[in-house]
Amino acid sequence: MSNVDINHARALVYQLLSSLFAREIDEQRLKQLTSEQAQQFWTQLGYAPEFSAPVASIQKVLNDLTSDEALLELAADYCGLFLVGTKYSASPYASLYLSPEEEPLLFGQQHQQMSEFLHQSKLQVQSHFPEPADHLAVILAYMGHLACHSEDAAQLSFLNTCIDSWLAKFVAKVIECDSQHSNGFYSALATLTLAWVQQDKQQLEQAIH
């Protein structure tokens, strides 16, 4: 594969992860995620040992979502984890993990920083996604953009500063809060995201040095 093909593939993974953190899975999205093309994608991604366990868990949950009730239960899991700000939730905002304040505010420093990154790239958060710019879905989508439009050094700098600096804390919180849910879909998604970011960071470091 050429570097262009590799970066395109990396961008696709970041965009996929972003989309799964951005909103609940509805029936239309489920069809996309369980299509023949998607199954091939999941299988290929799962060949890597560091991704195999979470990918297998994700595939199992998706393939078992055969009723409206099961889909609603997964949507309720998403809501309880990411939309309800309680101690039993895992808020997906960088500010809440990086701010030195005891009670960090949304739309804080990390939001302003991400807004500036988006502005510099002539991008913006879509109007149908009314969330602060430091939402994990926005950050992962922007990393996908960088994969195809920026040098390796710029990608690594953004990954270190805006993702790797807080992702492990977020993932630990997701796993802690998701433990009460039987299918563990979002624990697997969070685990896969962390493993992907760590592997991508290593690859970028090797490419630079």
Curated annotation (Swiss-Prot):
Keywords from the named record: Chaperone, Cytoplasm
Keyword tRNA-binding on entry: no
Cited Pfam families: Nitrate_red_del (PF02613)
Family annotation (InterPro entries): Chaperone_TorD (IPR023069), DMSO/NO3_reduct_chaperone (IPR020945), HscB_C_sf (IPR036386), TorD-like_sf (IPR036411), TorD/DmsD_chaperones (IPR050289)
PANTHER family: CHAPERONE PROTEIN TORD (PTHR34227:SF11), CHAPERONE PROTEIN YCDY (PTHR34227)
Primary location group: cytoplasm
GO biological process, one term: protein folding
HAMAP family named among the record's database cross-references: TorD
Recorded coiled-coil stretches: none
Entry's family note: Belongs to the TorD/DmsD family. TorD subfamily.
Subcellular location: Cytoplasm
Superkingdom of origin organism: Bacteria
Designated name of the protein: Chaperone protein TorD
Gene (name only): torD
A Gene Ontology cellular-component term: cytoplasm
Biological function: Involved in the biogenesis of TorA. Acts on TorA before the insertion of the molybdenum cofactor and, as a result, probably favors a conformation of the apoenzyme that is competent for acquiring the cofactor.
Lineage summary: Bacteria, Pseudomonadati, Pseudomonadota, Gammaproteobacteria, Alteromonadales
